[in-house]
Amino acid sequence: MKVFKDSVIYLVGELSSKLVPFLLLPYLSRKLGVEGYGSLSYYQTFLSLFLIVVSLTQEGAISRYFYFYGKRSLNLVVNTGYAYTTIIGSIILIGCWIAQSEILFYAALSSIFQSFLNVQLSVRQCQKKAWSYAFIQFSLTVTGAVFTVALLEYYQNDLVEKRILAILLSNLVVWFFSYFLYRKSTTSKKYQFKHYQSALFYILGFGLPLILHYASFFLKGQLDRIFIYHKFSETDLGLYAMGAQLALVVSIAIQALNKAIIPYFYEALKQKKLVVQQLHKWALFSFLLIPIPALIMWIIPEDVLVWILGSQFVGTKYYFILFLISTTLSIPYLILVNYLFYYGKNKLISQCSVLSTIIYVASLVALTFTEIKYIPYAGIIGSLSIIPILYFMTSKVSKTL
């Protein structure tokens, strides 16, 4: 009953927090236009890339530390991770300053505070503080919307840059208050240099093997935008990116359920109540759910989307449907990969990701030389390819336990 209650809280929190940006789409689509939205999508690609580098999946390291070693020295790992993010982030900021790119500077700074905030969310997830987690998420999106509207209404030029700046301000404000509350609830303790060194090695040991894994996610989620930006037009990218953004609603629901279930999933594995054969059955049955969102969207007339987004976005529905298919393929993926995460098989996860990414990139390159309407199929091919690989890897790991 507890897992169901938390799942509902996480789901409602995630959906309500993302509802504001979703409602903001008609405003952004009209304010930026299809070309401006395409340009925004391009620069958000760099924000995602910077986040991978400065974060080094600290939220995952925090979660695993909590369940394996307890909460006694959790603050040591949190602060050490923050120090790493600050140093690496500063190097990226210097690079942006040398390149004299103000918009990339904002993107880099935003990635730093987003990494800080992700750690705070991970701590609350580990502590099963579902309400606190949901409140932070909702606060982040509300402040993001307020800053976005304020900046885009006040300024008339460089609106894409102002949208990135709004994201930065939102991350900064919400992280400041969430960290303030975290510090109030945490007992201060002095640690020696060797303790910080051990914590850093733990973070690096957890995160570095996963660099390829998350780099693979970046390539699958962002590389297509770079290809389209340079191969086709900003208008084409705007339609494509809008379809992907709309499909994000389903992804949010899936991720919310996953985050709510993970603590109980790990506990079941720890107590030997869950075996790999059950996970394989769940992954297989989940394929029945994959076509449902796309079929629902196929029935809805495109006029509805055009009415919401504006007349410039005719053609978005086609991309929306295809992205829904590739998005829902994450359900069997998460079922299988969480098993490997629990047992710390990060190298295996990276190997799986690299193999599927190679397949995806090869498909993307080939499809780029056709027409833009075929490019979303690269995502479907890449998402499908990793599932049999994970099936084999989870079976292999279960035999060694």
UniProtKB/Swiss-Prot annotation:
InterPro entries: Polysacc_synth, PolySynth_Transporter. The keyword Transmembrane helix applies. One of its GO terms (cellular component) is plasma membrane. Pfam families: Polysacc_synt. This is Lsg locus putative protein 1. Keywords: Cell membrane, Membrane, Transmembrane, Transmembrane helix. It is found in: Cell membrane. Its main location: membrane. It comes from Haemophilus influenzae (strain ATCC 51907 / DSM 11121 / KW20 / Rd). Belongs to the polysaccharide synthase family. HI_0867/HI_1700 subfamily. It is a multi-pass membrane protein. The chain crosses the membrane at residues 8-28, 36-56, 87-107, 132-152, 162-182, 199-219, 237-257, 282-302, 320-340, 352-372, 374-394. Coiled coil: none annotated.
